[in-house]
């Protein structure tokens, strides 16, 4: 009884011309997601996913590495033009935006800050004492 060799078809990645880069920069990490114009996620990366641990995840260098990683994945989908949505006050925020603009073959069309701000909603948590 010889086993049959199972061959899988290679998954074809859809070609998307434009995309949106979501940069979520928290105090502890920087997460980047690339979507198509409809909002369907194509690829993502974060400082933690690249092996940075602890306080090193929130550094600008870790954010830069995460952007370079995710944009290399995004180029496989044929993305040439992107918009950027930035959220959060983290340390890797500015570096991540600059890195997206510096990547060859990617044109930044627009940039938007979508950080949620309360209009005096919920009471904030008590101040941290170190």
Curated annotation (Swiss-Prot):
Annotated TM spans: none
A GO cellular-component term linked to this record: ribonucleoprotein complex
Biological process terms in GO annotation: translation
InterPro entries linked to this entry: Ribosomal_uS11, Ribosomal_uS11_bac-type, Ribosomal_uS11_sf
Entry keyword set: Ribonucleoprotein, Ribosomal protein, RNA-binding, rRNA-binding
The keyword RNA-binding is assigned to this record: yes
Domain of life of the organism encoding this protein: Bacteria
Pfam families: Ribosomal_S11
One MF annotation (Gene Ontology) recorded for this entry: rRNA binding
Family note: Belongs to the universal ribosomal protein uS11 family.
Record text on subunit structure and interactions: Part of the 30S ribosomal subunit. Interacts with proteins S7 and S18. Binds to IF-3.
Function: Located on the platform of the 30S subunit, it bridges several disparate RNA helices of the 16S rRNA. Forms part of the Shine-Dalgarno cleft in the 70S ribosome.
Name of the protein this chain belongs to: Small ribosomal subunit protein uS11
Organism from which the protein derives: Nautilia profundicola (strain ATCC BAA-1463 / DSM 18972 / AmH)
